[in-house]
Amino acid sequence: MIQMQTMLEVADNTGARHVQCIKVLGGSKRRYASVGDIIKVSIKDAAPRGRVKKGDVYNAVVVRTAKGVRRPDGSLIKFDSNAAVLLNNKLEPIGTRIFGPVTRELRTERFMKIVSLAPEVL
């Protein structure tokens, strides 16, 4: 469950380390984002020679949440931290590698690239 001001780790190789959610996209009254939702983020911490720099604003898709994802069979998939993957304006991933596991909920037409790059799909 991600809302405005939430700090997230970055799960790709764009050079960003931590980002802050500045908006949950998808309706004017939308308050929370979960796995698979698109948010607007600001880069708070970045590597010196990365693709992105501190202060830049990007779209990102949430790939892991500490709150977890409830499956139809009743199981709950939780993670230790919140993580996102940075996207460009066409909603394609900027990075070429994904770090850590992602959930099966990302397996939609929009995010198949992220699922295929991920080392593990839970």
Curated annotation (Swiss-Prot):
Keywords, comma-separated and alphabetical: Ribonucleoprotein, Ribosomal protein, RNA-binding, rRNA-binding
Name of the protein this chain belongs to: Large ribosomal subunit protein uL14
Family statement: Belongs to the universal ribosomal protein uL14 family.
Gene Ontology BP, a term: translation
Any one Gene Ontology cellular component term annotated for this protein: cytosolic large ribosomal subunit
Protein purpose: Binds to 23S rRNA. Forms part of two intersubunit bridges in the 70S ribosome.
Assembly and interaction partners: Part of the 50S ribosomal subunit. Forms a cluster with proteins L3 and L19. In the 70S ribosome, L14 and L19 interact and together make contacts with the 16S rRNA in bridges B5 and B8.
One example GO MF annotation: large ribosomal subunit rRNA binding
UniProt gene name: rplN
Pfam family, one: Ribosomal_L14
SMART domains to which the protein is assigned, alphabetical: Ribosomal_L14
Gene3D superfamilies assigned to the protein according to its UniProt record, in alphabetical order: Ribosomal protein L14
